[in-house]
Amino acid sequence: MSAPILEMDIDPVWGDAIDWEDIASRAAEAAAKVAPELAHENLLVSVVLADDDEVHALNKQWRAKDKPTNVLSFPMLSREEVLHAAADEGAPGMLGDMILAHGVCTREAAEKGVSVETHATHLVVHGLLHLAGYDHELGEAEAEEMENLERKALALMGIADPYAVED
């Protein structure tokens, strides 16, 4: 299965006990199975596993939010360009950048009762969908569409629905 090429930059705070590159690659493959526009090796994504300070600074600069967030996505292509990228046989096109915050990811994983690996996998899928032009902040229908794609991608990896409401 084709998926975007991932260029990884991993801050030491993430540690080396876990193969983060493998986790991101598997997440990209699953995302490409549910969002075919991502199923192309001529798309390039920069994935940065950063500390909270770096994500905080970027979130403040680009979104005017003075706090870290779990994942930031910076698309380089419009939705239309993503859809047409598959036809381009040339050099890889830059789909965009994705940055995950270690501390936020770790805290959220603990709150959800899942491993950091599981939550990071979800965030990579989520970020890739943003880079492909999906946006849950545009409205309820868009949020539902994006969440359904996330659920399907995660299910392919044996990961439970992150949006399930527990009683």
From Swiss-Prot:
One of its GO terms (biological process) is rRNA processing. Its main location: cytoplasm. GO terms for molecular function: metalloendopeptidase activity; RNA endonuclease activity; zinc ion binding. InterPro entries: MetalPrtase_cat_dom_sf_prd, YbeY, YbeY_CS. PROSITE patterns: UPF0054 (PS01306). Binds 1 zinc ion. It is found in: Cytoplasm. Signal peptide: none annotated. It holds the Pfam family YbeY. HAMAP family: Endoribonucl_YbeY. Belongs to the endoribonuclease YbeY family. Single strand-specific metallo-endoribonuclease involved in late-stage 70S ribosome quality control and in maturation of the 3' terminus of the 16S rRNA. This is Endoribonuclease YbeY. It comes from Novosphingobium aromaticivorans (strain ATCC 700278 / DSM 12444 / CCUG 56034 / CIP 105152 / NBRC 16084 / F199). The lineage of its organism: Bacteria, Pseudomonadati, Pseudomonadota, Alphaproteobacteria, Sphingomonadales.
